């Protein structure tokens, strides 16, 4: 299936039922302080609570994902960066992102999920190259799921 690109907000798309699953990249430090992570924390607080709780338990591992099933669908926190910080530094680990995407494929394979991702997933705050990230998404999930990239 081709990936669709559209103007809009990925969090709104999940809340409004336009997609069933929202993917985003996050760090392994228990912080959701900027970008779409902060919006998820503020608008879908139970997704943040799962992430925070797992961090407090010491069970957040890079290359793994945390899935939160809530009233509006699934938020998938793909832990693909060890840290965060200054601009123009690559924090995302492409191998770990690919590992997370493969896990998402396994979790989603039994359903006909519509997946939403933010434009520049793992590329804006995480410092990755959007074209590389998009190729990973297309290669791992693109032929199996209806995927929409939301750009504000």
Regions found by a protein language model. Name each.
Residues 1-152:
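Macrodomain-like recognition of ADP-ribose-binding/processing modules
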């Amino acid at each position: 299936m081709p990936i669709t690109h559209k103007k809009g907000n990925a969090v709104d798309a999940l809340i409004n039922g336009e997609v069933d699953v929202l993917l985003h990249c996050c760090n392994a430090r228990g912080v959701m302080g900027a970008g779409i992570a902060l919006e998820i924390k503020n608008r879908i607080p139970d997704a943040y609570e799962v992430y925070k709780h797992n961090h407090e338990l010491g069970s957040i591992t890079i290359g793994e994902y945390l899935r939160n099933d809530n009233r509006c669908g699934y938020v998938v926190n793909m832990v693909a960066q060890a840290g965060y910080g200054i601009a123009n530094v690559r924090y995302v680990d492409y191998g770990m992102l690919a590992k997370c995407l493969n896990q998402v494929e396994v979790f989603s394979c039994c359903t006909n999920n519509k997946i939403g991702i933010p434009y520049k997933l793992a590329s804006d705050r995480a410092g990755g190259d959007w074209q590389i990230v998009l190729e990973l998404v297309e290669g791992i999930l693109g032929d199996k799921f209806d995927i929409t990239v939301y750009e504000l």
